[in-house]
């Protein structure tokens, strides 16, 4: 389906005289004539998502069978869109690869990706900072998602508050970012520290990493929601994808 980038490129070609208005009209009509969604019986694949939101529909692998994931993925790719499956199992990837042979599985982040169409590049850099090594799967979900959405990403991992010197050594990279995603479990203190050092938006991602009283990330979530530093927003527990989506929108403004 047509993306915002495709439409911008087409209009630019018309403005430069490289494509006539009649040909542009034919191309656009052909794109819009296609069904806005495809009913697979168990899912309705939204082919106009990229027009409304700038990026195609993303598949959440949780709760879907491998065959369902593969069928949705095949339909998305068939219409020329970029593929992103989050929380994907190895079994789901095997099923997807049977119909989308170019797909890639990112085991650390449990993502399936296949870039098929261009997206507008972000204006700056998104920095992904994570507190501990155990937080990296969520951080990688955010990093890979942001990259697929057209952003330049820098990773700063294992800089938790138990060793602040590790974080302070990265102040220049943090300050140069356009938006920062901070991933942390335990007590969730890292986003407040980072936000106190920079003048850019900080998106906090609590993770489910921690011992008993962390309550599966609830302690980190509440700590981040009660941050004393300004400029911090918070997404749901382990939601690296959601953080990356917001960061990408900010970076494309």
Please give the residue ranges for each predicted region:
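Long amphipathic alpha-helical segments
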Residues: 1-89, 94, 99
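Short glycine-rich or small-residue beta-strand-to-loop segments that form or flank ligand, phosphate
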Residues: 56-59, 83-84, 125-131, 180-182, ...
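Short glycine/serine/threonine-rich phosphate/pyrophosphate-binding segments
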Residues: 67-69, 135-140, 164-165, 184-194, ...
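Glycine-rich oxoanion-binding loops at beta->alpha junctions
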Residues: 111-113, 152-173, 218-219, 235
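Glycine-rich phosphate/diphosphate-binding loop of Rossmann-like nucleotide-binding domains
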Residues: 123-165
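C-terminal binding/interaction regions
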Residues: 130, 134, 171-175, 179, ...
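Glycine-rich phosphate-binding loop
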Residues: 169-207
């Amino acid at each position: 389906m047509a993306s915002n980038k495709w439409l911008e490129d087409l209009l630019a070609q018309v403005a430069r005289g490289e494509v006539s208005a009649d040909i542009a009209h034919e191309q656009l009509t052909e794109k819009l004539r296609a069904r806005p969604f495809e009913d697979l019986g168990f899912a309705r694949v939204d082919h106009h998502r990229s027009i409304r939101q700038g990026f195609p529909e993303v598949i959440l692998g949780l709760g879907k069978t491998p065959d369902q994931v593969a069928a949705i993925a095949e339909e998305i790719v068939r219409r020329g869109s970029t593929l992103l499956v989050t929380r994907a199992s190895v079994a789901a990837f095997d099923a997807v690869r049977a119909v989308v042979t170019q797909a890639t599985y990112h085991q650390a982040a449990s993502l399936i990706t296949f870039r098929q169409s261009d997206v507008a590049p972000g204006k700056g850099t998104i920095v992904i900072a994570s507190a501990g090594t155990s937080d990296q799967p969520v951080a990688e979900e955010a990093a890979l998602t942001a990259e697929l959405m057209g952003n330049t990403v820098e990773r700063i991992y294992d800089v938790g508050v138990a060793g602040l010197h590790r974080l302070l050594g990265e102040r220049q990279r943090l300050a140069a970012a356009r938006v920062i995603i901070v991933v942390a479990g335990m007590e969730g203190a890292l986003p407040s520290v980072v936000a106190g050092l920079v003048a850019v938006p900080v998106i906090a991602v609590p993770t489910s990493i921690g011992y008993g009283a962390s309550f599966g990330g609830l302690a980190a979530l509440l700590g981040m929601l009660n941050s004393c530093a300004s400029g911090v927003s918070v997404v749901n527990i382990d939601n690296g994808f959601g953080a990356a989506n917001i960061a990408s929108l900010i970076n494309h403004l």
